[in-house]
Design a protein with these regions (language model features):
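Copper-binding active sites and cupredoxin-like electron-transfer domains
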Residues: 1-320
Length: 320
């Protein structure tokens, strides 16, 4: 595989930069999101290659504008948050080169790798390079992140991504999207996350793929009857996620290691079933599938509603 690319421009609260808080309103966040390219949500199928080579460059000086007046400094792998979504199959080997071009120590923890952490996950200093190799032994969407202390700060500042390892019986679909949920704990304007807010576990904002409300401004587009798969991961660092599509029902659900529902049935109920939400604790993930029966605009949210209103909110435009 090619080295992991970067994509520039990936980062609402509900009611105008509330005086003294520095937190943009939902309208301000949507307006700014409309001006920049969205984080690419659609993911390509896994390649047939058995060895995947990626270089991840750690930096801690990237500025992400959230609105016309509010920005934050994010810590990134390859210049964006979340980091690139990697993909492969069971048995594939991933060869990761971590380059630390930041101003402090950084590291990598790949949940998809079943290996001793002592060397592979150690913190490296600015200017150092680390080689990290693992073979994928189990299917799923697996979190990867910086594991340098304090881990909550490194994750909250943006150093997180996903690795998709396909189940062996994964079926083709018309569209595949990856949604990585992240929390924002805003510090001083232009600065990094606020450690006290992180410890309180009460985020100011939440986002799918790094920018609140970006898929309100740039809706996903599918057609009636097309099969759609959403790969989902809650990268936290703190709060639960309950993924829901308003007006949609999931007929196939794959949750942390296996199917709980296939075409509306499972080993016990032989059809006629459905799912309304996909719940995740931090670092959990899976996928859901559905097709839309009617044209319209469907909204996907975190059904922890205060967090949907704080940015974990997007749209799907369905046409004939």
């Amino acid at each position: 595989s090619a080295s992991a690319g970067s994509h520039s421009g990936s980062g609402s609260h509900n009611h105008e930069v509330a005086t003294g808080t520095g937190i943009p309103t939902a309208d301000q966040l949507r307006a700014y999101a409309a001006k920049v390219d969205p984080y690419p949500a659609e993911v390509a199928p896994a390649s047939e290659e058995k060895d995947h080579y990626y270089t991840l460059v750690a930096r801690d000086d990237i500025v992400q504008n959230l609105s016309d007046d509010v920005s934050r400094t994010v810590w990134t792998f390859n210049g964006n948050t979340p980091a690139p979504t990697l993909r492969g199959k069971i048995g594939d080997t991933f060869h990761i080169t971590l380059k630390n071009e930041g101003t402090m120590g950084h590291s990598l923890d790949f949940h998809a790798g079943d290996i001793a952490p002592n060397e592979a996950m150690k913190t490296i200093d600015p200017g150092q390079t680390l080689e990290y190799t693992f073979t994928a032994k189990a299917a799923g969407i697996w979190m990867y992140h910086c594991s340098t202390h304090p881990m909550s700060m490194h994750i909250a500042n943006g150093m997180t991504g996903a690795v998709i390892i396909d189940p062996s019986d994964l079926r083709p679909v018309d569209h595949e999207y990856a949604m990585v949920a992240t929390e924002l704990y805003l510090g001083d304007n232009g600065g990094t996350a606020n450690a006290t807010k992180i410890a309180s576990m009460m985020p100011d904002l939440q986002a799918f793929n790094g920018r609140p409300f970006q898929y309100d401004a740039h809706p996903l587009k599918v057609k009636v009857g097309e099969r759609v798969r959403f790969w989902l991961m809650d990268s936290g660092p703190n709060t639960a996620m309950s993924f829901h599509i308003v007006g949609g029902q999931f007929d196939t659900v794959w949750d942390e290691g296996g199917y709980t529902l296939i075409d509306g049935g499972n080993a016990i109920s032989r059809g006629g079933g459905g799912s309304q939400t996909f719940p995740m604790l931090p670092a959990q993930g899976g996928f859901v599938e559905l097709s839309f029966k009617e044209p319209g605009t469907y909204t996907f949210v975190n059904h922890v509603m205060s967090l949907a209103e704080a940015g974990a909110h997007g749209k799907i435009e369905v046409t004939n």
